Amino acid sequence: MASILKPGDSYSVHYKYKDHSGKPCEGWESFKTKKEAQERKITVEKELLDGTFLVPDTMTVEEMLYKWIPIQSTKHKWSPKTYTQSVAMVQNLIVPYIGNRKVQELRTYDIEKFYATLAKTPCGQYVHGVKQTLTDKQKKRLLSSTSIHEVHTLLKTAFSYAVEWDLIHKIPLPREAPKANSEERTIWDEKTMLAALQTIENPALHLAVHLSMILSLREGEILGLQPSDLDFDAADGRGTILANKTMQRANKDALEKLDPNQVYHTFPDRREGSKSSLILKKPKTKKSNRVLYMDQALEGRTADMAGKAEAGRAERPREV
């Protein structure tokens, strides 16, 4: 099944195999000593016999990641934001450092060195895959441990596909993920919330902050609310709000590559040549769809604002 030849000063192991399409191929591997060649011959014959032989492939990490992204984004219905962030991570934090490495040649030690390099890398060193010239001040602001942990998470998923594709036998990542130092967010207490509401003079902003504080609505959910989401007669007159959509800005490149059924509406561009669009889309998870109950004060302010908005629409001149 395999043979050892001695062309010159080295020893070569010659064997035949079939690629993924069933095409017959020949393999040649060179070694400095006869012992190394004999050990490789035994290994190759065993792998060819039990079906664990790894078909040689020159695919690089960059090629593998750009093959994986469309599959992963379609399979898991990525949002435009997730797609954009993942592509940016590949372009700026992975490809410049290990993108040209062959997937089959990458070892755990290489990934450990890669993580160590990222820990010393300034934020914004690469933008759209292009190296930037940074100021001395910018060079001091290094990538966070959270960013490096996110790179690890992305690579772990991508390399699991490489295993399924029979590119590699096992994921080359270290068992222990880079530690992410999470910072605890500070939350306003009751006095701060009350002071904020008493200070805000703009009615629309006041209502938005009120909705965020009382119902824990996110910014995109508040901006995505429509009159049909408000039911002032429900819950014995307390009123309810249906949160089932969110507004966000998304890159047009991402929108072209993702499931259009995720987007309810794309708003017209205000600037010609804009690379992003404002969209109204489905929430990230089904659990985000929920009915929320208003208190008396919130119900009154919401009803008042909804009435003014309706009156404003009625006063607009109709297009002829």
Give the location of each predicted region.
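Short pre-functional
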Residues: T153-S160, H206-L223, T240-I241
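N-terminal DNA-binding module of tyrosine recombinases/phage integrases
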Residues: L5-S12, K16-E112, H128, E310-V320
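Phosphate-coordinating loops and pocket residues in cytosolic domains that bind phosphorylated ligands
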Residues: Y66, E105-T108, K120, Q198, ...
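N-terminal DNA-binding recognition helix of tyrosine site-specific recombinases/integrases
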Residues: M1, M89, L93, R101-Y109, ...
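Conserved hydrophobic/aromatic pocket- or pore-lining residues that grip, position, or stack substrates
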Residues: L65, I94, I111, L155-A158, ...
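Conserved tyrosine-mediated DNA breakage-rejoining catalytic core shared by Y-recombinases
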Residues: P7, T192, L225-D304
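Short, basic (Lys/Arg/His-rich) helix/loop patches that form interaction surfaces
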Residues: C123-V127, Q198, N202-L205, L215, ...
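Flexible interdomain linker/hinge and immediately adjacent N-terminus
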Residues: K113-F114, E164-L197
